[in-house]
């Protein structure tokens, strides 16, 4: 993400899009070989030139994001206003650091693969062969599944909640994320018009307290250190950002 690369890439994007500016320009991946200062200075130049309105990042760890925000503050540069992250009912790892960071620093969260690569679509059930041509029959390995029994428990609970409400598992999984703190939008990957229409239906309703509690419980992330210590020793001193992860544990 060198200065030369970013300036040239933005110009090429503007030509392809046939527009004068880009509303949100996000650094898609962390470049550990280019100084963050150089990357942010280039992005700041694009904003000041009027070619970009706002900047964001994607697939950064929390310390990378905070380092970038600190550099922007110290140097008077444009700061990231969004982060695009993987987050789903199946994988709530983002709640350890990335979601609390977004709440604390005022970043909007754009979620990619909110259906966990289709695993939460309702197509994949225990002891049932996946449909021919479905994504999980391809060599693509993201997101990784480390515990298939846990995955099926989540899928089964999701299907039960969806069936009781009369919605699809996919729509229910999307509605779950839309009700999570800091989440501002979902990047969906529907392949058909029918899938798209079904997915978009998630904005028309919200999960009730019991439904959300059921899904929270079955998908709860394991409390790793220092979070179990924080939940046990200082539960009355948690901020809103802390509560995004720790609320159910105290």
Residue ranges and their predicted role:
Residues 1-93, 97:
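Glycine/proline-rich, positively charged
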Residues 128-160, 164, 179-183, 197-250:
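Terminal-tail/helix-coil boundary detector
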Residues 18-21, 159-175:
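Acyl activation and transfer enzymes in specialized metabolism, enriched
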Residues 49-50, 105, 165:
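Helix C-cap/helix->beta junction micro-motif
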């Amino acid at each position: 993400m060198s200065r030369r690369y970013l300036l040239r890439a933005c110009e090429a994007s503007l030509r392809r899009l046939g527009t004068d500016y880009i509303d949100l320009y996000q650094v898609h991946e962390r470049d550990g070989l280019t100084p963050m200062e150089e990357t942010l200075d280039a992005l700041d130049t694009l904003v000041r030139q009027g070619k970009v309105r706002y900047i964001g990042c994607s697939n950064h760890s929390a310390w990378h994001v905070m380092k970038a925000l600190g550099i922007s503050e110290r140097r008077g540069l444009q700061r990231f206003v969004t982060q695009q992250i993987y987050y789903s009912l199946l994988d709530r790892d983002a709640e350890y650091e990335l979601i609390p960071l977004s709440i604390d620093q005022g970043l909007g969260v754009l979620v990619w693969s909110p259906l966990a690569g289709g695993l939460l679509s309702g197509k994949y059930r225990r002891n049932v062969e996946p449909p021919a041509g479905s994504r999980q029959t391809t060599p693509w390995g993201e997101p990784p599944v480390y515990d298939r029994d846990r995955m099926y428990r989540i899928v089964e609970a999701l299907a039960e909640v969806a069936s009781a409400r009369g919605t699809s598992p996919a729509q229910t999984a999307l509605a779950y994320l839309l009700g999570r703190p800091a989440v501002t939008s979902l990047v969906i990957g529907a392949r058909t018009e029918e899938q798209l229409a079904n997915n978009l239906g998630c904005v028309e309703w919200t999960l009730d307290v019991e439904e959300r509690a059921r899904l929270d419980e079955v998908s709860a992330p394991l409390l790793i250190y220092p979070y179990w210590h924080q939940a046990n020793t200082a539960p009355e001193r948690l901020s809103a950002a802390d509560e995004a992860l720790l609320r159910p544990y105290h």
